[in-house]
Amino acid sequence: MRSIIADSKRLVVKVGSSLVTNDGKGLDHAAIGRWAAQIAALRAQGKEVVLVSSGAIAEGMQRLGWSKRPREIDELQAAAAVGQMGLAQVYESRFTEHDIRTAQILLTHADLADRERYLNARSTLLTLLRLGVVPIINENDTVVTDEIKFGDNDTLGALVANLIEGDALIILTDQSGLFTADPRKDPNATLVAEASAGAPDLEAMAGGAGSSLGRGGMLTKILAAKRAAHSGANTVIASGRETDVLVRLAAGEAIGTQLIARTARMAARKQWMADHLQVRGHVVIDAGAVEKLTAGGKSLLPIGVIGVQGAFARGEVIACVGPDGREVARGLTNYSSAETKLIHRKPSGEIETVLGYMLEPELIHRDNLVLV
């Protein structure tokens, strides 16, 4: 089996905290130097690389003399602010050895949820790649809150891959890839060499092997691959402990787990809606509505809604959940949660009678709806 990275031109590489730090005791300068050397080798082959790197909080903890990761958000943000300086300095120093310029970009979910800022971020990243610069991206932990954080850099890597229409996402971790079961507990567990991104059985295989320094377990990587597939990007999950892993992947060697994007690529606007806008509420829809959305490509009408959960305003994203509790779609609602509670289970012709007005006959128009 040949690595999908060999034929990929635009790559997003995500490295976790354990691969750039000395077990949380500050940054591992030698390791970062090796990543810079490998990315320089990929650049020499004509590949474009965006690096998503953890490590700021771990470096900040070292500089502040903290042995344990703090729990309070203000202390985490302080550690990130202190550590980000060191992270940027080390990367710049190491890439300069290869005559490569770097750029630091810090993002929050709010940056990508705003359509104008999303397009500006995309334009900036593409310009940096055109100029031969390696963008180094991290979540802006200094200002982020629970409501607007990505949650982990695996998710951030997938969203960046979608943002720049990358060919592949490489998630480097301290694990060898995805196994059929936890290899630490099951001696019969085997490595999954290749599968379709988003395949239902993958989530069942994924364990929660997150460390105390980082936030991402295997499940977040599986979900990241599913998201990256929205723009047609394939994903490789591999061990960053493998010698020259990036160079070997680029040479065609199959390492770790390959998750192939086999679903149709989403239109750019729908991709943005699916991945970057936060869900504000849920509507439960009946089996007939599920069929019309998933097989018929229809809009969601109020008559198909049997329940409303959460508080949302007109124009916000809501999830559409079937009778079995499974999310089938999400989209921009034409009515608030209060209005939806009044008009659900009613035909569109009765909306004006109930509300005194009718904004639209659909709760979610098909042009503003994405299947998930």
UniProtKB/Swiss-Prot annotation:
Q: Which family does it belong to?
A: Belongs to the glutamate 5-kinase family.
* Protein source organism: Burkholderia ambifaria (strain MC40-6)
| Organism lineage | Bacteria, Pseudomonadati, Pseudomonadota, Betaproteobacteria, Burkholderiales
Catalysed reactions, as listed in the record = L-glutamate + ATP = L-glutamyl 5-phosphate + ADP
- Output this protein's name: Glutamate 5-kinase
Localized where? Answer: Cytoplasm
Short name of one Pfam family for this protein?
Answer: AA_kinase
SUPFAM superfamilies in the record, alphabetically?
Carbamate kinase-like (SSF53633), PUA domain-like (SSF88697)
Q: Which pathway features in its UniProt record?
A: Amino-acid biosynthesis; L-proline biosynthesis; L-glutamate 5-semialdehyde from L-glutamate: step 1/2
Gene from which the chain derives: proB
Domain annotation PUA: ranges: 280-358
Name the job this protein performs.
Answer: Catalyzes the transfer of a phosphate group to glutamate to form L-glutamate 5-phosphate.
